[in-house]
């Protein structure tokens, strides 16, 4: 008899067929076990779950007594209580290798859009304001040969450094827990403390995950240390930045602009002051949102779940210590 799994996000038909070759698949639109009897029953029998979003914590795990593996269609896993998963001997799989280049492209697009005011001036054209030669009030600032500061030098940070160095001739600073030899050798990147990075960078790009250490890592004091001409880009996790402090800094000119793909609350409330500021480019968390990459992420998550439930895990496991038990 095939193991039972719960699929809680729509995936391409061919990938669902692959799951069905290995498992009995119960498909749902999201995870709401408290409100959905059929889902609750499926979770009682599920040995694996696969999807994205939803809060997977102790309360959830109490409803999944047979669960052996969870496969998230994402690189981030801050919605999972890893300690609770460990206590229940549940493997957590994610997709860190698939989306690197696409997210780096998104970050670079935010750098360009904020510097050259692409969204703002495009809207002015659509509004009929382009009536002759443009003046200084339409101008942006250069990107090439400006200094980029990268918070977090993982896969995405490295891919961003490559684009900045080779594509735009930008000096690269980075802040990370350890020296990244490849970044320093290939891109002449310089590791520095956070205060130095804030003070010297023209563009500060956040690629960090959300942890206890990174929560509100950028707040009022840190924003005050940036150049007044500085631009903040966040494509890591929203709560890494104190959003209220950022709004204040953008309103009073402490920093020049911000490009944001992530927010403290998502979707971003329509009442957010960020949506009223012309010096903000706000995207709906589209860092990995291309057809090719989203397919690749789903494919990787399917492979991960199959590996986890057949005892063939070689990569992409958040809690590999469980494999030794």
Swiss-Prot record:
Q: What is its EC number?
A: 1.1.1.79, 1.1.1.81
Q: A Pfam family matched by this chain, by name? A: 2-Hacid_dh
User: Could you give a GO molecular-function term held by this entry?
Assistant: hydroxypyruvate reductase (NADH) activity
Determine the domain of life of the protein's source.
Bacteria
> What is catalysed by this protein?
glycolate + NADP(+) = glyoxylate + NADPH + H(+); (R)-glycerate + NAD(+) = 3-hydroxypyruvate + NADH + H(+); (R)-glycerate + NADP(+) = 3-hydroxypyruvate + NADPH + H(+)
Where is it localised? Cytoplasm
Presence of keyword Transferase: no
Q: Which GO terms describe its cellular component?
A: cytosol; plasma membrane
Q: Which UniProt keywords apply?
A: Cytoplasm, NAD, NADP, Oxidoreductase
Family note: Belongs to the D-isomer specific 2-hydroxyacid dehydrogenase family. GhrB subfamily.
How does this protein assemble? Homodimer.
Q: Which NCBIfam families match?
A: PRK15409.1
Function recorded in the entry: Catalyzes the NADPH-dependent reduction of glyoxylate and hydroxypyruvate into glycolate and glycerate, respectively.
> What is the protein name stated in its UniProt record?
Glyoxylate/hydroxypyruvate reductase B
- Species of origin: Serratia proteamaculans (strain 568)
């Amino acid at each position: 008899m095939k193991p039972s799994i719960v699929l809680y996000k729509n995936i391409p038909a061919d990938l669902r067929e692959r799951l069905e070759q290995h498992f009995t698949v119960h498909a749902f639109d999201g995870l709401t076990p408290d409100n959905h009897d059929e889902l609750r029953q499926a979770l009682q029998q599920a040995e694996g779950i696969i999807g994205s979003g939803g809060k997977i914590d102790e309360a959830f795990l109490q409803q999944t007594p047979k669960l052996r593996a969870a496969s998230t269609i994402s690189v981030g896993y801050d919605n999972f209580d890893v300690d609770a998963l460990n206590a229940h001997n549940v493997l957590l799989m994610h997709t860190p290798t698939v989306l690197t280049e696409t997210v780096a492209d998104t970050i670079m697009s935010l750098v360009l859009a904020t510097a050259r005011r692409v969204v703002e001036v495009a809207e002015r054209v659509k509004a009929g304001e382009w009536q002759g030669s443009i003046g200084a009030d339409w101008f942006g600032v250069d990107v090439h040969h400006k200094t980029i500061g990268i918070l977090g030098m993982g896969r995405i940070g490295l891919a961003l450094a490559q684009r900045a160095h080779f594509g735009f001739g930008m000096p690269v600073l980075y802040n990370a827990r350890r020296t990244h030899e490849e970044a320093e050798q290939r891109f002449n990147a310089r590791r520095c403390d956070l205060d130095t990075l804030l003070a010297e960078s023209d563009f500060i790009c956040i690629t960090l995950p959300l942890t206890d250490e990174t929560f509100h890592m950028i707040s009022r004091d840190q924003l005050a240390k940036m150049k007044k001409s500085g631009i903040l880009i966040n494509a890591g996790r929203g709560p890494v930045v104190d959003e209220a402090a950022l709004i204040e800094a953008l309103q009073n000119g402490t920093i020049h602009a911000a490009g944001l793909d992530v927010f403290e609350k998502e979707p971003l409330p329509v009442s957010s002051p960020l949506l009223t500021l012309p010096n903000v480019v706000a995207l709906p968390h589209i860092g990995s949102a291309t057809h090719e990459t989203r397919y690749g992420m789903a494919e990787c998550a399917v492979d991960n779940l199959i590996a986890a439930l057949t005892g063939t895990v070689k990569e992409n496991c958040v809690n590999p210590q469980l494999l030794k038990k």
